[in-house]
């Protein structure tokens, strides 16, 4: 396990994981299962820990990276998509233990052992929930930190450049970055009730999508990193502070104070009745654009998209460099307790995490290519039995559709790709649509007549 140390002596382990919810799957239960999983992880870690999830979205150009030699039609297929832009995503989960003494030289063997036990527990929880996750080693951890520092997630080699910082953006070499804090603690504009998903209208039909689905399609960007940080404080201490706040508001009766008292009572009731956990959270979006791109267009898109969900982006994120540095993997405890964190319940905090995954090619020796919703080829094992995740041991399937619906077009494409991979095919058809295909491949053609 690669471990990141900060100058204050905090140490962190980084997991590369895959979000469990398939994009556009319309499965509401999977969003709630994600919420339950990460709420349980917060309970497992407890006081003095933080989870720091980073979802990285990168605009790339499609390039066929398979080493196989293709026949003419397959070569033409991949050439057609060459250079097409699409969004790729990757997710990292950093688990950090705070060093209260704020010194690199205050090593505590007992705390270190507790840290190693808990990070392995989190890994087991993710694995038991069916989430793909693996710890980054020393070299991968170093590479990820360097890429984050340069905000470069697509080039094979990464170079460091100087920073030029103002109140609005951070300039670094051939790109500019801007950090958008989701919540202004002086004016927390969040909906009073939050769910882990929102509904999108598709052809007059409601479809559930991630509450934060807007972060993966921001126009004009090179890279986007959605930062989600949850800090686990001492529960008794926070409840005592809440009680003091309630009494202070109650001592000065006016409408706003009475509303505050009611809100605090409601939170205390939920904690007592349902054993909920109080957490501090911070969310921000780091956007990277080319120097000749107007970043205001991205700003307008983000503000409008989040405004529709009832979340209003902070307009006072003038501490750009501080936010960027404290968003580094393992450096989250540098976030200001007064201005960059806000208190809420753990399940509400987890609801604002990004939960979806973008489709990637399957890990299988048998590849049949389809285009995904972004219009780029994705390899799928349609047999369901050759890949790493075996779904069945029966490779039969049935193609049904009315005349002119494209059955032959699909079957010809699929048979061609399967034949290129030395697959034996038995094709049963009503009519003689595939007689020519059979002759082309020197197959055996059997027909029946009454």
How does the language model describe each region?
Residues 1-356:
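Extended, folded cores of ATP/NTP-driven motor/assembly subunits in large transport
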Residues 12-15, 258-261, 388-391, 410-411, ...:
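Short amphipathic alpha-helical segments, especially helix-boundary/capping motifs
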Residues 28-31, 35-43, 365-448:
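Glycine-rich phosphate-binding loop of nucleotide-binding enzymes
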Residues 51, 105, 109, 180, ...:
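Generic detector of bulky aromatic hydrophobic side chains
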Residues 348-353, 358-375:
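Pre-P-loop entry segment of helicase/translocase ATPase cores
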